[in-house]
From Swiss-Prot:
Keywords: Glycoprotein. The lineage of its organism: Eukaryota, Viridiplantae, Streptophyta, Embryophyta, Tracheophyta. This is Insulin mimetic protein. Glycosylated. Expressed in seed. It comes from Cnidoscolus quercifolius.
Length: 25
């Protein structure tokens, strides 16, 4: 999609997931 907001949202989600993964380690 070319929706900037959606892109931002996905970026945010990815970041969040990385943090979650770090917590699980």
């Amino acid at each position: 999609t070319k929706d900037p907001e959606l892109k931002q949202c996905k970026k945010q989600q990815k970041k969040q997931q990385q943090y979650d993964d770090d917590d699980k380690k």
